[in-house]
A protein has these predicted regions:
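Extended, well-ordered protein cores
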Residues: 1-274
Length: 274
């Protein structure tokens, strides 16, 4: 169960202090690191970071899947090049078979849930979704069935909803049950998303946004907006709340990272009264 992960960098190396948490956030145990340098010319060098890692015993059968290996390669490169966040949710690539971008959607849902009245931290919510990696995968499957231009299927939406409900009935811990049901409600409440949109060069947009029917999301404080849009990216998070189909409003830069939705909701209440 010992594997080697080799990272090649052009004219740049990676310190062990930076590489260690990135590798371990994917669920590997880092055993050693051997650096090599290949000199191409006076000004050009290739640095090779050879990481020796231990694969969790229960995942040895999965790690030989070529599709999963490609997902891991893409995700690890994305984490080292700061295209995705490096946090423990990246374990969902190895444990749940999700791609780096699919994990980013789950991460966006976690960030949104942390802004609601759910009495748990983003870290605890993440731990729960990692523990129930199968449900996290089903949540993405539900999202895909609702919004993917190629795989949209109302029948499949209903089938996946029934599967998730059956899995939720097996959860015994009250806190975990509350978190998973809240995540389920978020996906069910989604109306639109930019997840599948691409730029002119064919790459995905560097941010993910989703529009929700607020009244369908569990644990939201009253009054409920009619709709809200949450935006997640590596650089920032944002929310847009609407009290009605026609509404006045404005922009606000918030320093309240942990509860900016509460701040914006207060402003919306004031606008609705006016």
């Amino acid at each position: 169960n010992i594997w080697q992960i080799k990272l090649l960098r052009y004219n740049d190396t990676v310190s062990l202090s930076r590489g260690l948490p990135i590798i371990e956030n994917f669920g590997f145990k880092l055993l050693d690191e051997k650096p090599y340098k290949i000199k191409l010319s006076q000004d050009e060098k290739i640095y090779i970071c050879d990481f020796g890692v231990e694969v969790p015993a229960g995942l040895l059968s999965k790690i030989n899947d070529p599709e999963l290996i490609e997902k891991l390669k893409t995700a690890i490169v994305a984490a080292f090049t700061r295209q995705i966040e490096s946090d423990s949710l990246n374990k969902l690539v190895l444990h749940g078979g999700l791609s780096a971008r699919q994990v980013s959607l789950i991460r966006g849902i976690v960030k949104y849930m942390a802004q609601t009245n759910l009495p748990f931290s983003a870290s605890y919510i993440s731990d729960c979704l990692k523990k129930y990696a199968n449900i996290s995968g089903q949540l993405f499957g539900l999202f895909e069935a609702k919004f993917c231009p190629r795989h949209h299927s109302a029948v499949q939406v209903s089938e996946i909803q029934q599967l998730i409900t059956a899995e939720l009935n097996k959860v015994e811990n009250i806190a975990e049950d509350q978190i998973l049901k809240a995540a389920f409600s978020v996906v069910n409440a989604m109306l639109r998303t930019n997840y599948y949109q691409t730029l002119a060069d064919g790459t995905h947009k560097p941010y993910i946004s989703f529009k929700l029917e607020s009244a369908k999301v569990l644990n939201l404080p009253k009054p409920y907006p009619l709709y809200e849009v949450f935006v997640y990216s590596l650089r920032f998070e944002a929310i847009h709340l609407r009290g009605g189909k026609v509404a006045r409003g404005g922009l606000r830069w918030s320093d309240r990272k942990e509860d900016f939705r509460t701040e914006v909701l207060g402003l919306v209440k004031a606008q609705m009264v006016k």
